[in-house]
Every structure is written in structure tokens, then in C-alpha cells.
Amino acid sequence: MVWISLGLRAIINVEALNMVESVGNVTRHRKAAIVYRTKSGYVIRWVPAISGETMAHAYQTWIAELAKKRKLPICSYCSINEFVKHSQPELFGTDPWEQKLNQIIKQRNYDPHIVEVEIIKNCVVEDIGGFLFPGPRPVKRTSRFSNGYLIPAIDAIEKVAIEPQFHVRHAPKAQQVIGQAQMIYYVEVGSAVYTWTFALDIDGIGRTSMIKVEDVISNDEKIRRIECAIDSLALMLDSKIFGAKLTRFNPLIDYESIVVTISHRYPFNVSPPSHSNYIKDTLHRSKKFSEFLGDEVKVLGYRVDIEEIEKYNTIMDLMAKVKDYVKEFLKT
């Protein structure tokens, strides 16, 4: 097994990356309840948050874009960033392999393994991001990547802001024609030191997992998909293009630190970046993990100041080295 884990902290100011509802003329930001400990006990607080689904959609969008440019297989809907993922027969696309698979599942006694094999072979987004077909014989592929919400750091929880911003659409000429063309509206925006975690099961790419475990693509194809998965993560983080309302509420994002680990035989995850000491804690745990299990864990970082961690000046340099280590581990 080769496993990648990533944790980061970022100062994000004036963002509207995940909105959940409109009440009258107010568009509300997503909020989540978090629990943390103080000197007097535990406290619950509602804070701005960006959902894991939001981040997963952005990541899979980058996978789809790279897949098209690199001539990797991708299904009809994923190619236009609609990740409905063969969830119903009506949503099977127009590609010949999809039409053929649609005929197979109409027989009702189909082999679920065959369905998983065909979708993995023909769509890199569903290979990496998983899918669920709830038919007479359900077929479920668990996503090869996992990620959480972007939530404020616990050690900066008192420095969180969420407020409605006042806006006016000023259209005096249009108002003469239709009336009430000039309108006021509010958009809630959040500012905080946000944290995020991500993990990627490298070995699971191009490999079935539901009925039986087997590789269904060539080794060369697997390497190309692994590179696509890592490059998509690098592009998303470096470009800072993820989330909603970027055209008018593109936030100021400043990464404080990013830590990536690559483990060889067992999954090792970066410590939660809820506190600034997560970098030291990750390094300490990686050493104990290696001693206990005899596994090798590489620890790399961007904007970190610990001597024993491999440091890189850009996100692209960091992720390029991650790819190198992954390929090295896959050979052993």
C-alpha cells in the first residue's frame, strides 16, 4: 500500500466559498458546530465552514480537466463536471461503453463486479472519486480519496468572523421599465484561519474493491492516473480555485503551512491541523509509526520550519517530490 496524507492551515479572508440557503434577500454561509476545550470546560460554537463535498467537487473537477487534456478515459457526464456517476440508468451517457453497460444492467441478473470493472476502466473520475449504482444488485465503489470540511483552527477560534455584506443593484433606467429593478441584498462572508485534511489511497487506483480485488488497468495506465490524481490536488491548492462565488467574492488565501506524508505499507495520516503544533506532532508520530510497524514514512512540507522535514518553496515543488516518492514506493 502507498498512502498520501495532507494537512494544511490557511488564512482565508472575506470568503463566500460555501453558501447554503437564501432567506429573503440574505444569502447565508454554511455554518457548523464545533466543540473545543477551554480552561473552564468544553464549549460549543457555530463557525463558518466549507463542506467536504465542496472540496471534493473542486478536486474532481480538476481531475476531469486534466483527464481530458491527457487523453485519460472519462465518462460523458464527468467530462462536463456533472458528477452524477451512473447513479441511475437514465444517467448513463452516450458513449458506446455506457450504452453497452446500460443493456447489461437491464438484465437484472448482472454481475456487480463487471459493472465496477467497466466503470473503472472507462472513467478516471469514478475510479478515483468512487460511485454508487443502487440497482437491483447495488454496485458501490468507495472513493480512493477522502477529505474533510474546511473549519477554523481551534487555537484561533476567537479570531473568527462571519457577517452579512450589504450590496445594492443600482439600475435607475431599468427601474423605469419594470419597477423594483434597484434592489438591496446581503451575502454572508467568513474570515478565519481554516484547516483542512486530505488522504489518497494510491494502491486502490485502477483496482476493484467490492466483490473481489484485482487490477483492471495496465501498470502504465495506473501511473498516468496516479499522476493525474496528484497533479489535480497540486493545481487546486496552488491556483486556489475551489468553492463557490469566486467571480465576485474571490477570497484572499494565504497558506500558513502544508504538510504531506507518504507511507509505504500502512496508512499514516497527518495530525489534525487544529493547533499549530500539528507539524511537530506529525513528525513525532511518523517516527513512532515507523519504529512500531517497520514502515517508511516520508514527511514533506511547505512553509514549515522544522529541520527534519523536507522543505519546499512552492506547492508545485512539494507535489513533484510527492510524485517521485510515490513512484519509488510503488517499485518496492
Language-model-detected regions and their locations in the chain:
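Active/ligand-binding-proximal structured segments within catalytic/core domains
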Residues: 45-60
